[in-house]
Amino acid sequence: FELGFPIALQSSMISISCLVLQGVINSFGESVMAASNIINRIEQLVQQPFSSLHAALTTYAGQNIGAENVERVKKGYRQSGAVAAIFGLATIPVAYLFGENIIGAFVKDAEVIAIGTKALHIDSLFYAVVGMIHVSRAVLNGCGDTGFAVLNGLTEVVCRVVYSQVFTRIPFIGYWGIWVTTAATWVTTAFVCVLRYMSGVWQPEKREAKRKKW
């Protein structure tokens, strides 16, 4: 319960923030809604390798932190981060060269294809950042840093709500603010994740020292 509940709460909070963003998306009409749905499907496909890496790294981190082998956890983090970054960066040329064809495979409406293609161009620049979120969360969750799960979920909620209200109301951005919001949320969340990892509070000796302090 101590490990599972914060992670479940994190997922719930993220889902709530997505619903808030969906409300903003719906306000821009059918073409934007259709393009957003397609981008979400593509994003789900892109995140499959990240999710698999996340699951494997969570187990790896848990086993090694249990054996008090912190250096192996750090090595796993670095190597997994490199894999995630390479995969994420590799999606950029694919999105820019074949984006229109990819969106066209889902829909034939010219306006939706145009919106979806540009949206894919925006988001693909930040898929490597998504990979770092998965890698960082995997290590932190695997090492039992349960308090962070709630903090991280709250970060996503606040970012999606605030950014969506700010960016979509800027006249020269308009509905493109939907995808700018997504990218900005990823960057902020990744920053918080990496910062938490670098703080080292997930390491057993530091957690124990913190408990004694309190």
Model-derived regions, located:
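Small-residue-rich hydrophobic transmembrane alpha-helices
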Residues: 22, 35-99, 130-152
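Short runs within selected transmembrane alpha-helices of multi-pass transporters and secretion channels
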Residues: 51-55, 123-142, 148-163, 177-194
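Helix-terminus/linker motif at the lipid-water interface of multi-pass membrane proteins
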Residues: 12-45, 63-64, 101-110, 166, ...
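Membrane-helix interface segments
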Residues: 31-32, 146-147, 174-175
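Hydrophobic faces of transmembrane alpha-helices in multi-pass small-molecule transporters and flippases
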Residues: 1-20, 24, 45-49, 53, ...
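Short alpha-helical transmembrane segments in multi-pass integral membrane proteins
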Residues: 1-5, 61-126, 169-214
